[in-house]
């Protein structure tokens, strides 16, 4: 049986992703300038004109994706967002490490100090977990969710982005 056809596996994956991304968003939103904007600057990959807006928006995207996974609403969109963020985090950390620099990646903001050399090993498994949730059939992906409480006509309209 494929992992993405097992309701318990997909629910577990959703809760794991939710935990990590809600924790990450919280840690950055405590002091967004210090823990998100400065972390993006420290990577030195984005141009200065893009680093600040990216640092300001990223915690809110993490919050949206984490809430989507927790409540089972927009899970496909949330999983896609988590997968793309994990891929971009992996690439950014790989670039920094290839330059021989050691930085705090800012992954969990004020909650935990994290080095890019350590957290890079979590990015690809998180991406795999997110893609497993994204490709799960909707009856598996939405098992035990708030999405089941919506009227059926809304479910049909939202099925494409869910």
Segments (PLM) and residue ranges:
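Extended, low-polarity transmembrane helix blocks
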Residues: 1-31, 64-67, 71-162
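Solvent-exposed, well-ordered loop and adjacent helix/strand elements within mature globular domains
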Residues: 20-58
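Transmembrane alpha-helical segments of multi-pass membrane glycosylation machinery
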Residues: 56-66
